[in-house]
Amino acid sequence: MEPLLWHVDATTPSHIQALQSGSLPPASPAAALTRVQRALSFFRTAARKYCKQADAPDLFALAMTRVAEHNDIAVDARNVEQLFHFVGQHVANTAERKALRAALREQRALFKASLPGACFPAPAPPGWGIPKPPPLPPPFVWKGCRYNVVAPPPRIPQPPPLPKFAPFVRNNFRVVAPPPLGEVYQPVGAPFPQTRASAALSFFRTASTCRQVLVESCIQQPAFMTCCASTGEVQEMTSMLTEARQTGKILTPKEVSQALAQKRKEIKGAEENRISFDEGVHLTEADVFHRLSLAKRFMAHKRDRTLVDVLMPTEHEVVRYPGTRPDGTLQMCVSALPRMSEEAARKLLEKGWKNSKNVSLDIGVTSYMPYGAPIVAFMTIMDGRTDDPQEAALCANYMDLGREKSKVLSLPLVTIPLSEIEHDQGILDCLYIVTYFHGVQSYQPGTLMMSYGTLEFQEYSNNSFTTATRVRESWDQILKRNENLGKRVHAGIGVLGTIEKEMDQQLEDFPAINLETRPRPVVRTFQNAHQPLHKTRSMRIGTTSFTGNTGRTVLPPVVKTYEEGNANFDSLQSKPRHSSASTAHLMCAVTVVPDPTCCGTLSFKVPKDAKKGKHLGTFDIRQAIMEYGGLHSQEWCAKGIVNPTFTVRMHAPRNAFAGLSIACTFDDYKRIDLPALGNECPPSEMFELPTKVFMLKDADVHEWQFNYGELTGHGLCNWANVVTQPTLYFFVASTNQVTMAADWQCIVTMHVDMGPVIDRFELVPTMTWPIQLGDTFAIDRYYEAKEIKLDGSTSMLSISYNFGGPVKHSKKHAISYSRAVMSRNLGWSGTISGSVKSVSSLFCTASFVIFPWEHEAPPTLRQVLWGPHQIMHGDGQFEIAIKTRLHSAATTEEGFGRLGILPLSGPIAPDAHVGSYEFIVHIDTWRPDSQVHPPMFSSAELYNWFTLTNLKPDANTGVVNFDIPGYIHDFASKDATVTLASNPLSWLVAATGWHYGEVDLCISWPRSKQAQAQEGSVSITTNYRDWGAYWQGQARIYDLRRTEAEIPIFLGSYAGATPSGALGKQNYVRISIVNAKDIVALRVCLRPKSIKFWGRSATLF
């Protein structure tokens, strides 16, 4: 503020009386002092029109200087008032004031909360500033036991009288020392410490006077400028001369400079990193700093006093795996490295400490990777005040995450000025950590890799001149390394031997990376900000090989320098230029990296007003791989059958306002018939099959990774067949709440990992009969989007607990794999877990509570909060235990329990928003408890397949024949009326793709005549191929009077397992009935012995 005042005063014409006195000559020092007083009074009075702060002149000077520099103008007396009022209008705005100085918020709050009686300036002109304060209250009287104290009334501070200078004459120059400041009384109810305001104003007055006198002296005596020294140098030289006089030797100025240079202390090994492999090595304050006795502390000169402290600014900061970029390069992860809190820095500043030096930084890392895993982390400490990586990178190190603990220590990193925290808010958090991971094979992005904590040793000084320090001189005194590497098992009781996983796996070379700085935030200015360039500078770090002392076994490299040459390189064979593949690819750009995992693409248009159930696109996996070609199709053709892992990546632009979600359904057995569904994809029907729902608000690239064998139970053949056709269906899962500007394009890429070679078609069965569940069962079921209206209604939403048996949807009945499995028992109990994803627009938000409920009537909030519940705020996970009157819910019936959803608060949306708050519930896992539930049928496990009535025998022979093949399907015949039965066995066959095993075919029939009058027989034979070929096995003939028969049959085909349909020539059972007109009905039942099922699917009927 003071230089700006003098610049304005120097440009003020002599005839202007607003800033100078007319009674004194303009050239006299008294007149200069009067001008300074008037200038300060003008700025104080004008500044308080906009801001009630003690340091308002400094605030306005900073703002005016920045505005003048931005507009390329000079501040003088002609434009100072206009510029001041322009800046004041911006400072009056809370946002602009916050951008200038965040520290003023605390003072502003104190001012508003201050008591009446604070000193106020002269009345402001009409229309400026805040309302005038209320009149002063009567004096406050506090009565004690024996005395009365009356607080004096507040008084407005008056400018001090003109200082009287005591001249001190020297040979070549003159120094004027101002008188000491007087005591300033702080009135009751002052909004801020009066000592700070008085000290600031006194400093400006004194500094302005001294500056004026100094300028006049420099003009009169030019030699004075060559003799001016800083205050610290004068004091240091004075003390050295005094010490020399006492010892009897007078030093020359050159000898004094040499003596001062010898007093500097430098730490050996600064800017180095030291890695300690011992978990027991911990630095203490005594290891880093010299201890001083109390006598030395108090006898030391004030300028040489230091304060040391040990802080732990970071206790537990986690670092997750960021994944790799689409081109395969490593991606960085930025994490915080704070120094101290702003409150702690202000307390140190109030005590007089100006600078904070980072003496030593101890970073401890805890790895969450398996022991011995060859994963390396590259950690770099960066300076956030620069965008140049070469300047920002302070120190870096490679960490072996195969060891649980790692530690890194480094000597001085940076010194920060505590006195500038108000002007530069980025000082306290100027350091951050950039981490790269290498060696990760299959961990998903977001996996927790490690965590770190920091221990910081700081030294504070009260000035910038002193060279005193308490830091020890070398690394050897700070750190004593103690390596403790060895076996996993060191000792034990009764241990004869140990088997341990290899810990010394060779570390792979860390690839080259582009070290970048963190993005810069947007800084608000007084003028319109220009659009920044979307470019960042980077620093290339080459490939690093770990062949030194890493604690792991190092494999000797095999280098072949010349082909077919001896030690003398006699037979050196040259190759033509650009003849090798490695040099041929160098002609391409280094940033263009082909993706070796991509095996197919799909593009489709999304309507701007996409409606729920809209079919967007179909992706045939087998056809896409063959058409895409490349290494994957060649490898697939060579292996014939593989068990791949697919990754579906949908590239859709992130948009949190559309309120749109797109789903992807996997169908391997041609169960989805789009024409039968009206060329639409109803979400309730599609969700019965394996599905993944993508919300456009979550990311720009949405991924779904699944293993083909886990979903289908078998390998993927490269030849097309009539049974399997792996297909992905993309459709709109929820209607977008905000209509887009136009139809937009979406790209889907399919990526594959072929996996190891397999030698069989069937893999691990998905389910075996009899059904046996483990500790958990994967339901994996999405439910159609629920919505909470904006009309303020609090009606309860629910999801029924009938998780078994067929269910009726909007267009079709459906039976899924999870419904078929859970329908074997009459009831179920336990805990269900899942997630909730909001598919609503960002304009609409709400919170709700999830709870178990049984009744139709909605509960009260007290009933909900008394029981198990979970409050959801947007997206989140939940786990709810079932709660019914009998602790269980019926598997195939409604009304015995439901998952209740009750709006809690909201929804909140703008006035123009017309949609509701929508969310999708996904039930992932069921965890049964110890409750026992009986099966649906008796322990005999006999299930009816079909019943034949109205038999139509041949008119001539009176015989009727029925062929029952070796696979379970919907039996049909033209010679009788067929009634198909429905039971858990038939549901499981319909919900899977393949089955195989042995069953007993149980046949029974009622007759219409009495036993003694009954004539006829039933012939049952096992056959293969056509009947005329007579490939027959067992053949039995039963009298019609017996009414029942049993015969075993194998379910399968030439491929092993069989689908629910004909697959080549299969074995079958022929039933021939003589005199069939006397049979009322023929029932065919199945008694399973051992059946295996493959594939998670569903059937729509």
Curated annotation (Swiss-Prot):
Disulfide cross-links: none
GO cellular component: host cell plasmodesma; viral capsid
Alphabetized InterPro entries for the sequence: Nepo_coat, Nepo_coat_C, Nepo_coat_N, Viral_coat
GO molecular function: structural molecule activity
Pfam families for the chain: Nepo_coat, Nepo_coat_C, Nepo_coat_N
Post-translational modification: Specific enzymatic cleavages in vivo by the P1 encoded 3C-like protease yield mature proteins.
GO biological process, any: transport of virus in host, cell to cell
Keywords: Capsid protein, Host cell junction, Transport, Viral movement protein, Virion
Alphabetical list of SUPFAM superfamilies matching this protein: Positive stranded ssRNA viruses
The family this protein is said to belong to: Belongs to the nepoviruses RNA2 polyprotein family.
Note: Virions are comprised of 60 copies of the coat protein.
Protein name according to UniProt: RNA2 polyprotein
Organism: Tobacco ringspot virus
